[in-house]
């Protein structure tokens, strides 16, 4: 039941409604994710999320995927407070995921507008990435995104050598600083929208 009238501009078979009173806070610490054919962690909740002190080893797709899906699977909507800290990512996203990125913020919105972000307040701090040259971060429709004090080591695989480390699509308020990027890494960023 709703505590007030449903807005008249909602369209049947077009808009989605989420019961945000039934969404969890999530804390994932001291875990070891390995050799999955899919992503290591799929996360979508509007409440507080902490993913810290974990190891992600050779996840087939993105080690961490943050969705926001109202197109196919109808998973939870936007995230508003995510901390990804002190994790180790080794050889992840070798077989797929959004842009083959180790961490992907990939909501399903079809219209990408930096003034109308889906996700907010995502901090990726103090992690170690050992990657084969694929992107460490793909973010779409995200506001107030921080990527700092991370260490990125790239191996010499020709498969992903041309991929930028960061791909940002319709994002606003992005801070990427104080990171250690090994020389072999392609330090390019790609901006879309």
Show where each model-derived region lies:
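Short glycine/acidic-rich loop motifs that flank beta-strands on beta-rich extracellular proteins
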Residues: 37-44, 60-67, 89, 93-101, ...
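Parallel beta-helix/beta-solenoid
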Residues: 23, 28, 36, 41, ...
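Short, recurring structural edge motifs at helix starts
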Residues: 14-17, 38-40, 70-75, 106-114, ...
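Small/polar beta-strand repeat architecture
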Residues: 1-30, 34-35
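Non-cytosolic beta-sheet module surface loops
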Residues: 4, 55, 128, 139-141
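Active/binding-pocket-proximal capping segment
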Residues: 46, 56-62, 67-71, 81, ...
């Amino acid at each position: 039941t709703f505590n007030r009238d449903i807005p008249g501009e909602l369209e049947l078979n077009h808009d989605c409604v989420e019961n945000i009173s039934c969404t969890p806070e999530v804390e994932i610490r001291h875990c070891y994710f390995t050799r999955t054919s899919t992503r290591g962690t799929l996360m979508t909740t509007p409440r507080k999320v902490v993913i810290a002190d974990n190891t992600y080893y050779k996840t087939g797709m993105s080690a961490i995927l943050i969705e926001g899906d109202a197109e196919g699977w109808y998973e939870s909507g936007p995230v508003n407070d995510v901390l990804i800290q002190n994790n180790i990512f080794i050889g992840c996203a070798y077989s797929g995921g959004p842009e083959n990125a180790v961490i992907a913020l990939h909501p399903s919105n079809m219209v990408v507008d930096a003034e109308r972000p889906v996700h907010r307040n995502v901090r990726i701090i103090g992690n170690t990435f050992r990657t084969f040259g694929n992107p460490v971060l793909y973010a779409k429709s995200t506001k107030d995104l921080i990527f700092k004090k991370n260490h990125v080591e790239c191996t010499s695989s020709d498969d992903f050598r041309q991929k930028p480390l960061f791909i940002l699509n319709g994002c606003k308020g992005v801070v990427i600083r104080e990171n250690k990027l090994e020389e072999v890494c392609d330090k390019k960023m790609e901006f879309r929208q």
